UniProtKB/Swiss-Prot annotation:
One Pfam family this sequence matches: KARI_C
SUPFAM superfamilies found in the cross-reference section: 6-phosphogluconate dehydrogenase C-terminal domain-like (SSF48179), NAD(P)-binding Rossmann-fold domains (SSF51735)
InterPro entries xref list: 6-PGluconate_DH-like_C_sf, 6PGD_dom2, KARI, KARI_C, KARI_N, NAD(P)-bd_dom_sf
Keywords: Amino-acid biosynthesis, Branched-chain amino acid biosynthesis, Magnesium, Metal-binding, NADP, Oxidoreductase, Repeat
Domain called KARI N-terminal Rossmann: residue spans: 15-208
Top-level EC class: oxidoreductase
Protein name as it appears in the record: Ketol-acid reductoisomerase (NADP(+))
Residues binding Mg(2+) 1, per UniProt: D217, E221
Positions annotated to bind Mg(2+) 2: D217, E389, E393
Provenance organism: Buchnera aphidicola subsp. Melaphis rhois
């Protein structure tokens, strides 16, 4: 097998990277007739598998689960997840041959082996679904010619797919049909129906390609979505302790602060996030953000370059063969940090205090969102896709940190995302530590003192914030998010 993306010529690569179009609401119907009455079998019952299945069942679809023989015999966590929620569970041999749509939601590292087995049992002219295109794009696995291959990629961890659905909303999703496997020209309608069934029509469904999804997804999760949040949590916490802040308060300010601050981003972009600051704080955050962008630009671009070239995938797959040795080392290292082990702060922190005492956190978010977006765009990825991967998914990741800190985030994201996040944060932490030497009173841990304002400076800062391309595309895309529900902070 070989990297599918690297086998294409330059023109084909560009066409695939640039494929991303928001589907108008008038073409999305909750009736979902295409998959009604069909046998849908989900392979794997982890975070994505369970939560997508719950949403699909609640949308009136017939869902069952295929698990390995040993998973059923040993009654492992996947078996518990499925059976405790009332789903029928069977072996590959027993239920895959009955399926009209087989959705493979096992971890990326298992895809090659799992898909080889699935193809032996799938009936002629059936459909194979993925929620991440890594195996197709980076591994280059070939699928039987009669099988239609589709993808629905929710832009968040599986837990948030369910939570947003229960709120009556949903999470954005990219849908795609593998151009090498659509023999009956039915892939698009089936993928669209699947996306509707998990609630994504409430937030936005984008018609994309396997390649655009993989390259943008890897970039987003490695940098701003997971890697930057991880590195910033650890460094900001240590900085607060250095400043003499109560450790448990510092822990809560960081742990819950990301969720509170990014909730404003979800509803009104970077503009609203900075509007939550005083004018003095906004100007300070703006200029801190400019410095951070300059510092982090080479690292963000390196990650994008390694994703495009396949270098990242090659190195990660080598670690797979090495029994995840590097992944496990990084995982243990993060779990043993002071931030992860600090005591819980039980007092309520007022919402505005997170903004007032987290000015640096606001600056970090602004810098990371804009950098991730800008570098995706210069690589050929469309603005719509770059927006979801650098901004909209951010509060959904922050929600996981708010629950059980970085442990929860790393638990619910994929192993691929976790590996990439550790890779980025390992390089980002020294840069952030050095940047802490530039902090002034009011940047982190306490409120900045109000100072005399220059009207012209404030006007120019506001104009710069509002005119950034991610703010322009964000206003357009948020018009489709008609049922967005605010999250209440505890």
């Amino acid at each position: 097998m070989k990297n599918y993306f690297n086998s294409l010529n330059f023109r084909q690569k560009l066409i695939n990277l640039q494929k991303c179009k928001l589907i108008d609401n008038q073409f999305l119907s909750e009736k979902n007739n295409v998959l009604k009455g069909k046998n849908i079998v989900i392979v794997g019952c982890g975070s994505q598998g369970l939560n997508q299945g719950l949403n699909m069942r609640d949308s009136g679809l017939n869902i069952s689960y295929a698990l390995r023989d040993d998973s059923i015999f040993n009654k492992n966590q996947s078996w518990i997840n499925a059976t405790s929620n009332g789903f029928f569970v069977g072996t590959y041999e027993n239920i895959i041959p009955t399926a009209d749509l087989v959705i493979n939601l096992t971890p990326d590292k298992q895809h090659e082996q799992v898909v080889n087995v699935l193809q032996k049992f799938m009936k002629p002219n059936s459909v194979l679904g993925f929620s991440h295109g890594f195996n197709i794009v980076e591994v280059g696995q070939l699928i039987r010619n009669d099988i239609t291959v589709i993808m629905v990629a929710p832009k968040c961890p599986g837990t948030e797919v369910r939570e947003e659905y229960k709120r009556g909303f949903g999470v954005p999703a990219l849908i795609a049909v593998h151009s090498e496997n659509d023999p009956h020209d039915i892939g698009f309608e089936i993928a669209k129906s699947w996306a509707i069934s998990i609630g994504s029509h409430h937030a936005g469904i984008l018609h994309s390609s396997f390649i655009a999804e993989v390259k943008s997804d890897l970039m987003g999760e490695q940098t701003i979505l997971c890697g930057m949040l991880q590195a910033s949590s650890l460094v900001c916490y240590n900085q607060l302790i250095f400043q003499g802040v109560n450790p448990s308060y510092a822990g809560k300010l960081i742990q819950t602060g990301w969720e509170v601050i990014t909730e404003s981003v979800k509803h009104g972009g970077i503009t609203l996030m900075l509007d939550r600051l005083s004018n003095t704080a906004k100007i300070r955050a703006y200029f801190l953000s400019k410095k951070l962008k300059k510092i982090f630009f080479p690292l963000f671009r390196k990650h994008m370059d390694d994703i495009i070239s396949g270098e990242f995938s090659k190195n990660m797959m080598f670690d797979w063969k090495n029994n995840d040795q590097q992944l496990k080392e990084w995982r243990t290292e993060i779990q043993n940090t002071d931030f992860e082990k600090c005591n819980i702060y039980y007092k309520q922190i007022p919402e505005q205090e997170y903004f007032d005492n987290g000015l640096l956190m606001v600056a970090i978010l602004k810098a990371g969102i804009e950098l991730s977006f800008e570098i995706m765009i210069e690589t050929g990825i469309k603005e719509e896709s770059a927006y979801y991967e650098s901004l909209h998914e951010l509060p959904l990741i922050a929600n996981t940190i708010a629950r059980k800190r970085l442990y929860e985030m790393n638990l619910v994201i994929s192993d691929t995302a976790e590996y990439g996040s550790y890779l980025f944060s390992h390089a980002a932490i020294p840069l952030l530590k050095k940047f802490m030497n530039e902090l002034q009173p009011g940047d982190l841990g306490n409120k900045i003192s109000t100072s005399e304002l220059d009207n012209i400076t404030l006007y120019k800062v506001n104009a710069k914030i509002e005119s950034h391309p991610i703010e322009i595309i964000g206003k357009k895309l948020r018009l489709y998010m008609t049922s967005m529900v605010p999250i209440k902070t505890k």
